UniProtKB/Swiss-Prot annotation:
Its main location: cytoplasm. It is found in: Cytoplasm. Substrate binds at I70, E71, L72, H89, E90. The gene is queF. It catalyses: 7-aminomethyl-7-carbaguanine + 2 NADP(+) = 7-cyano-7-deazaguanine + 2 NADPH + 3 H(+). Its EC number is 1.7.1.13. The active site is at C48 (thioimide intermediate), D55 (proton donor). Coiled coil: none annotated. One of its GO terms (cellular component) is cytoplasm. This is NADPH-dependent 7-cyano-7-deazaguanine reductase.
Length: 135
């Protein structure tokens, strides 16, 4: 086997990291203060479980952290892991929210998945967890 063939058979760095998809968090630096964090992920992709066609969405995450805060590179790589996943819009939004809640235990969290129109249909799925506190 040539070195080129050996390299081709090994997953690329990005593919390995995406496959791991670990949501890493760090301690909230100000747990006594209510505040909100807004994260936008404009390049979410998954596959339609019915047609196999790609679906594209902007994910908008707004949350009030509890004991832990989500690390940004980790959430990017986690979201990228959905690229080849056959999943409905509704299940994608709910599963992502569930995984984020387990990882960081927020006081309150809302995820909006704004999917690009396909076939003249525009879908926005909004899911939430917990009770929003005044900041």
């Amino acid at each position: 086997m040539s070195s080129t063939e050996a390299q081709a058979s090994k997953p690329l760095y990005g593919e390995r990291v995406i496959a791991e998809g670990e949501l890493i968090c760090f301690d909230n630096p100000r747990p006594e203060r209510p505040y909100e964090i807004s994260i936008e992920l404009p390049e979410f992709t998954c596959q339609c479980p019915f047609s196999g066609y790609p679906d594209f969405a902007v994910l908008r995450l707004l949350y009030q952290p509890g004991p832990r805060v989500i690390e940004l590179k980790a959430i990017k790589l986690y979201v990228n892991s959905y690229r080849n996943c056959s999943i409905s819009h509704e299940e994608a939004a709910n599963k992502i929210l569930d995984d984020l809640v387990v990882a960081c235990d927020p006081v309150w969290m809302q995820l909006e998945a704004d999917f690009n129109p396909r076939g003249n249909v525009h879908t926005v799925v909004r899911v939430s967890h917990g009770s929003r506190q005044p900041c």
